[in-house]
Amino acid sequence: MASSASSVFAAFDKDGDGKVSASELRGCMAAALGEEVSEEEAAAILATADTDGDGLLDHHEFMRLSAAHQLQEPAEESLRCLREAFDMYAEEEETAVITPASLRRMLRRLGSEHQRLEMEECRAMICRFDLNGDGVLSFDEFRVMMLMA
């Protein structure tokens, strides 16, 4: 996890000076969000985590900002995205479960490496997160699976 966080910091720190400027923050946020972030917005975001007041984020400040952002991500939005992903795999909206057959069907649609996936392999994938042993994944079981991924 720490190496992943360090990679994110390195990606934001374009000039490699060990600090993230408002300009670097702005550029990476625009790339990640797909929309422009103003210099003022980037500076305001940076200021919330700039504990030493130098106008830059060091690694520690950046990690704190990143953690705070993750905690503030609206639970409703996260839940909505999970529901959309679940619904792509679920058999029918009435039953709202992922069966081995619906998992196989969706994985085959996603790409050629899954074209030869056998039903038994799909059962095994579901079994790992099937908390109540009914052979299918409910939305709650899917949420647990995604949290562990």
UniProtKB/Swiss-Prot annotation:
InterPro entries: EF-hand-dom_pair, EF_Hand_1_Ca_BS, EF_hand_dom, EF_hand_pair_protein_CML-like. Signal peptide: none annotated. Ca(2+) 2 binds at residues 50, 52, 54, 61. GO terms for molecular function: calcium ion binding. Residues 1-35, 37-72, 77-113, 117-149 form the EF-hand domain. Ca(2+) 1 binds at residues 13, 15, 17, 19, 24. The keyword Metal-binding applies. The keyword Zinc does not apply. It comes from the Eukaryota. Ca(2+) 3 binds at residues 130, 132, 134, 141. Gene3D superfamilies: EF-hand. Pfam families: EF-hand_7, EF-hand_8. Keywords: Calcium, Metal-binding, Repeat. PANTHER family: EF-HAND CALCIUM-BINDING DOMAIN CONTAINING PROTEIN. Potential calcium sensor. This is Probable calcium-binding protein CML25/26. The gene is CML25.
